[in-house]
Swiss-Prot record:
GO terms for biological process: chitin-based cuticle development. InterPro entries: CHIT_BIND_RR_consensus, Cuticle_Struct_Prot, Insect_cuticle. The lineage of its organism: Eukaryota, Metazoa, Ecdysozoa, Arthropoda, Hexapoda. Residues 36-96 form the Chitin-binding type R&R domain. Coiled coil: none annotated. One of its GO terms (molecular function) is structural constituent of chitin-based larval cuticle. PANTHER family: CUTICLE PROTEIN (PTHR10380), CUTICULAR PROTEIN 65EA-RELATED (PTHR10380:SF238). It comes from Drosophila melanogaster (Fruit fly). This is Pupal cuticle protein Edg-78E. Component of the cuticle of the pupa of fruit fly. Residues 1-16 form the signal peptide. Keywords: Cuticle, Signal. It comes from the Eukaryota. GO terms for cellular component: chitin-based extracellular matrix.
């Protein structure tokens, strides 16, 4: 019985229709790099993917939006510059808050600098 259900599930997965395989480009804009190195592009597909980016030799800014396989709407904005890639989105993990005792310890260290080291007398 379990073998039958397993085979049936396997066949179902193999035959599942992939929504992304037939996606078509609905709109496309590409402004090639100009003399100063500025560029921008944007496109949208029939399966809901939207991407846009603009930038120059110093960095770029952009946005991406799509629907995840779980049906969640994902929206991401980002900048990329000499300091790295900086994504922003509600779906991204965030670090936990710094505990109060750590903040107190850091404040204590800041307000009580170490005494200057004394040379050993010989």
């Amino acid at each position: 019985m379990y073998k039958y259900l397993f085979c049936l599930a396997l066949i179902g997965c193999a035959c599942a229709d992939n929504i992304n395989k037939d996606a078509q480009i609905r709109s496309f804009q590409n402004d090639a790099t100009d003399a100063e190195g500025n560029y921008q592009y944007a496109y949208e597909t029939s399966n809901g993917i939207q991407i846009q980016e603009a930038g120059n030799a110093n960095g770029a800014r952009g946005a991406v939006a799509y629907v995840s396989p779980e049906g969640e709407h994902i929206s991401l904005t980002y900048t990329a510059d000499e300091e790295g890639y900086h994504p922003v989105g509600d779906h991204l993990p965030t670090p936990p808050p710094v505990p109060a005792y750590v903040l107190r310890a850091l404040e204590y260290i800041r307000t009580h600098p170490p005494a200057p080291a004394q040379k050993e007398q010989q």
